[in-house]
């Protein structure tokens, strides 16, 4: 079990979150709330598994064992009620590369892709670097909280818009979109 009260100094350990503050923001004393990176120790069992693997001494290419694919299938079934095939599972090293893969797979250069700002900056960068056209549908603050501006979104939609990148929980505003909001979004983009 993790000890969430134990504070670990990560400065000097090649931590992008902590070691890149001065380079990125010009101030090494800021509180780095700019990246989704935890500051808690992993459970001891995880450390032991990594050490056991490292003790083998060879670090060549690895495959995806059936146990991994079965774990993903089980999780999707348990949490979403979805029965998925192993062939549908694609590993990605992180969310940013997955975004880029999806943009490339489902759109063509020049297509328009919508993001809802303020949003995690790699969303916009991934759209631009893939040669797509970025459209911004800014979130609005209503009743003291961020909400989607579906009226504005509907006005932006045309045949050249091929994708909307939805962030939930939304980074950086922290909103988890409700079922009703997601249904309204789905209705808007039909």
Predicted regions and their residues:
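Conserved core of the PLP fold type I
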Residues: 59-190
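N-terminal small-domain helix-loop-helix segment of the aminotransferase-like
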Residues: 2-94, 101
């Amino acid at each position: 079990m993790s000890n969430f009260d134990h504070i670990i100094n990560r400065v000097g350990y090649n931590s992008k979150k902590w070691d890149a503050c001065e380079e990125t923001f010009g101030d090494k004393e800021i509180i780095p709330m700019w990246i989704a990176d935890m500051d808690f120790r992993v459970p001891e069992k995880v450390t032991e598994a990594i050490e056991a693997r490292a003790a083998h001494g060879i670090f060549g290419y690895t495959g995806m064992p059936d146990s991994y694919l079965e774990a993903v299938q089980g999780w999707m079934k348990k949490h979403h009620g979805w029965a998925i095939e192993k062939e549908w599972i694609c590993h990605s090293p992180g969310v940013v590369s997955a975004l880029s893969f999806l943009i490339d797979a489902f759109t063509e250069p020049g297509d328009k892709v919508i993001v809802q700002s303020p949003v995690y900056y790699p969303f916009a960068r991934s759209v631009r670097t893939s040669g797509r056209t970025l459209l911004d549908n800014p979130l609005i603050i209503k009743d003291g909280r961020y909400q989607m501006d579906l009226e504005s979104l509907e006005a932006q939609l045309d045949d050249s818009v091929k994708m909307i990148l939805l962030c939930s929980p939304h980074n950086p505003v922290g909103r988890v979109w409700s079922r009703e909001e997601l249904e309204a979004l789905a209705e808007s983009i039909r």
